[in-house]
Amino acid sequence: MQPYTTVKDEAHVKALTHVPRNKDENGSAFHGVTFLKQLTMDNPNHKNVEIWLNNSFIESNNPNKIDLQSNGWYRYTGEQDLSKVVSILLYINDSLSSSDVAKMNLVYGTHKNGFGDQYVSKTVVNTSVDYKLSPISNQVRYTIVANANIGLRKIRIDTAPAESGLPVTVRLDKDIVYEDSSKDEITVNLYDKADNRLVGSKVYTIGELPEEIKFKVDRKFLKKKSKRNYEVRFEKINKESIFVAEGKNKVDTDGYTSSEETVKANSKESTELKYKGVIMTEREVGKEMEVFHETLTIPLKQLPKQKTGYGFELKTEASYNNELAVPYDIKVGALIDKKLIDSHLNYEQKEGNTYVPLEETNKNISSDKRNNDFTFELPHVNVEQKTGALFTDQQVKDKDSRIKNALKDGKRKLYAPIWADLGDYNIFVKSELPIGANKVNFEVTQPLHVYAFMYGTIGSDTLKDDEILVEPVDPRNPFSNGKPSGWSDEDVAWLKR
């Protein structure tokens, strides 16, 4: 507090101020208590200065009219306890000019205050001359601020296999007000909330504290296909210098480990194979948790019953939706009973069956990258004329030595051998790579009923369904019971050759 005058020599200057009080008329608002801690003078011009104290609140717009000999006023000697002082009066019992300095320094102490508390100090000054101007010399507002303000903003957990560890991403806000706080340390801990188990911890100085922190929950804490709630917390904070906004010292979200399961379906029993799993969760402080999914959908259709020697398609369509627009490839193959595979085809043998890799013949990606539609089909085959033997395109390219005749387009079909056993077979259409964040596989059972032969023979149990009836005849007398309807004399002559 420093009185100032524009007059050459002004006598009996008095200045009155008070220790701030919560909710006082000046606008102070704070927690705890405030007290006068220290009082000193700067008096380089050696003026006759007196400091008077009062442990009560004395208010006046004219300090010169205050009677210092009554109402509890006492002169400061430098020895008294200042903690109870409420009112302070500076009396310059001398003349004061514009070049003179007489400054009283006040140091206030606080107890149990908080960041954001405000203290307003007002000084009333006048002299023995009764000026008509406002007696308020100055009014100063002080606010308690932290050296640094920090707060958690968001936590995110991506689904991953338990063996790989669970990735956790934390984002926060940081504002350093005073560089003094840069070396203060803070601990950022990650807990499994259900049992309050610490699963991750990082220590930073405020200066080093990044806006994004990454944890990985160790696999020893994880199980396959599980869901746990995790909470990140600010701990071991220097509350004297670091401020964390209310509610921003912790935030939680659920974490999922990959299901790593095989989803199975039978086209005879279902019209669709479907899997839906969580791929990520996140939560912003003060908001609801957001959950993101992936979905695999495969429409199912029964295979029509077949006769030997005829071909049929094994087309498989799959749709993969990822709400985070993360792409994943799908690879598909079929396990087929080797009784249904032509012996000339050089497919791999696997699990006691013939493995036929299905080829991706179409892929469509939506504009938002979230949907991927796939079509898989059997490899193209070639049919040898006269023999009916089948060969892959690669066998043709490699000039397989068994190819003796011209080839015809066999399309993308599976041909049951002409003399295959009749009965029921299961074709297994399977994924060859784990799909998505949940690393799922699928297996579709496609029942196939082979009910008749291409060539029926005498004694066939399926004669009425067999495609072509083959019956031996004596070419010298092929039709002992008369020429069948539809046969010409030329036809009979050809048969007798």
Swiss-Prot record:
UniProt keyword list: Plasmid
Compositional bias ranges of the Acidic residues kind: 488-497
The organism's place on the tree of life at top rank: Bacteria
Region (Disordered): 474-497
Protein name per UniProt: Uncharacterized protein pXO2-28/BXB0027/GBAA_pXO2_0027
